[in-house]
Structure formats: C-alpha cells, structure tokens
C-alpha cells in the first residue's frame, strides 16, 4: 500500500500504521480513510495529501 504525504506540514500517512488515535486502523489504505478524516498534525483534509515518492 502506498504512503501519502501532507503537502502542508509533511506528515506521512503510512497504511501499515494507520492513525489509531483518530479511528483509522492499521492496514487501512489511504483511499479507504473516511472523507472527513484530517491530518493529525495540521488539520487539513485528505485533498491536501499526495502520494509519497518513497
């Protein structure tokens, strides 16, 4: 699964880790995160994330 990076603050969403503090279980692909999820560091929406080149 591909990682995604926040273009505002640089936070990297790693599907292997998820975002359990905000209700996203490990193993959840970026596409399957709810549309109302926001970056846990800066609060922007999913539309401010791009696929990581890593």
UniProtKB/Swiss-Prot annotation:
Transmembrane helix keyword on record: no
Cofactors, names only: Fe(3+)
CDD domains membership: rubredoxin
Statement: the UniProt record of this protein carries the keyword Metal-binding: yes
Residues binding Fe cation, per UniProt: 6, 9, 39, 42
One GO molecular-function entry: iron ion binding
Cofactor binding comment, as recorded: Binds 1 Fe(3+) ion per subunit.
GO biological process: alkane catabolic process; oxygen metabolic process; response to toxic substance
The EC number(s) this enzyme carries: 1.-.-.-
PANTHER family, alphabetized: RUBREDOXIN (PTHR47627), RUBREDOXIN-1-RELATED (PTHR47627:SF1)
Protein name: Rubredoxin
Organism of provenance: Clostridium acetobutylicum (strain ATCC 824 / DSM 792 / JCM 1419 / IAM 19013 / LMG 5710 / NBRC 13948 / NRRL B-527 / VKM B-1787 / 2291 / W)
Phylogenetic classification of the source organism: Bacteria, Bacillati, Bacillota, Clostridia, Eubacteriales
């Amino acid at each position: 699964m591909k990682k995604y990076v926040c273009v505002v603050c640089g936070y990297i969403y790693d599907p292997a880790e998820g975002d359990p503090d905000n209700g996203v279980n490990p193993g959840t692909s970026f596409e399957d995160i709810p549309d109302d999820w926001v970056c846990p560091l800066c609060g922007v929406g999913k539309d401010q994330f791009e696929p990581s080149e890593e």
